[in-house]
Curated annotation (Swiss-Prot):
Pfam families: ATP_bind_3 (PF01171), TilS_C (PF11734). One of its GO terms (cellular component) is cytoplasm. The lineage of its organism: Bacteria, Pseudomonadati, Pseudomonadota, Gammaproteobacteria, Thiotrichales. This is tRNA(Ile)-lysidine synthase. It comes from the Bacteria. InterPro entries: Lysidine-tRNA-synth_C (IPR012796), Rossmann-like_a/b/a_fold (IPR014729), TilS/TtcA_N (IPR011063), tRNA_Ile_lys_synt (IPR012094), tRNA_Ile_lys_synt_N (IPR012795). The keyword Lipid biosynthesis does not apply. It comes from Hydrogenovibrio crunogenus (strain DSM 25203 / XCL-2). GO terms for biological process: tRNA modification. One of its GO terms (molecular function) is ATP binding. ATP binds at S28, G29, G30, L31, D32, S33. Its main location: cytoplasm. It is found in: Cytoplasm. Its EC number is 6.3.4.19.
Amino acid sequence: MSYQKVELAISKLIHLYPSPVQFLVAFSGGLDSTVMLDALCKHVSPQSIHAVYINHGLQPESNQWADACKKACERLGVKFESVDVQVSDISRQGIEAVARQKRYEALYSRVTKGTILLTAHHQRDQAETLLLNMARGAGISGLSGMPYVKNIQLNEQTLQHCRPLLNVDYDAIQSYAKQYRLDWVEDSSNQELDYRRNYLRHEVLPKIRHAWPFSDANFAKSAHHLNESLALLNELAEIDLQHTDYTDFYLSFTNVKELRWSRLKNMTRYWTESYVSGLRLNAKIYQWLQECLNNKNPQAKPKMLLARGELRFYNHVLYYFDDLKVHYCLAFDEFDASALQLFKALDFSEQLSSKQGGKLEGTVVRPLNPNDLSSGSQKKALKKWFKESKVPEWDRQRWPVLEKEGQVVAILGFYTKKSF
């Protein structure tokens, strides 16, 4: 009986995450999440489940669906929460992408240590995702589809997002709902063909299934094979990153520039996916980066403005700034070179003696300005130090100085006033 595939999938989940784990269930009230929540309640205590309904406010029935979800959770004895999110500024990404982004932001913010996020994506969803990504020319990351388990990096913690029904076919989910006489809500927007996924679901995939009855399963197999290939590429990227220098905002190519472009591209992809928040690479960015790497002019300082932030390239180093802070004024104990995204993560405490510790009260850290150095020899020496230290030009213009009572007493990494 096909409905048992759902129960087997939930049994696999419980084996993977034994008690006392908590489950955060993305619960829309639709067929898929209703089946997942019901099956989960048959295997674990309802007290270990927290169901969350994300209200985008895009449909007139949104509040009614929230009420239906609340009543369903009350019947099951499950904690319920309805979260309102605002979907706006859709000119660039489209309403589907923005709604999905807002939904996951809300869900991820509620995942804590010891809690697993569950979403009800199934085999048909995987087939749709694979074909949608193929249609937009995605690389191997997109063609590998949705993973069964995805690690989430949030607030220096690694949390997990699991899709327990990912290998379950849609017929089995319908069969489960029929077997246990479940009720669910129907979103009328799922029939609107203006949405790309709906067009694929209602117009394209039925024709493919008619010719190839097991196409959903085969698409899922292809995604799985590509996921294995992606894992190998990630391992290669980790090896390459060991030979270079990087943080969450820059990647140096100095020691790896002799590698072929495809390998550098793979390393850059992995770096952004693993360490950089808010940056999504595309063909245009890759082309720009390749041109930067091939540029033989050491004085070149290419820059690329993005919808969010900007990319810069200097001295074989790629930088990503989401908000480059040019103006700042910080108390001494608030200063953090990494937070300011300075290439040299230096610290004033490294150049100040213990005797100077008592003199720090009332000091502030601010950017360097042209009048901080009075003599030409000092300016020349600082310029030489910047060059030898390979400090990018934009960092030179905002380089930190320590000031007390209107006087510069130290320049980060370069100078400390003798009388201080």
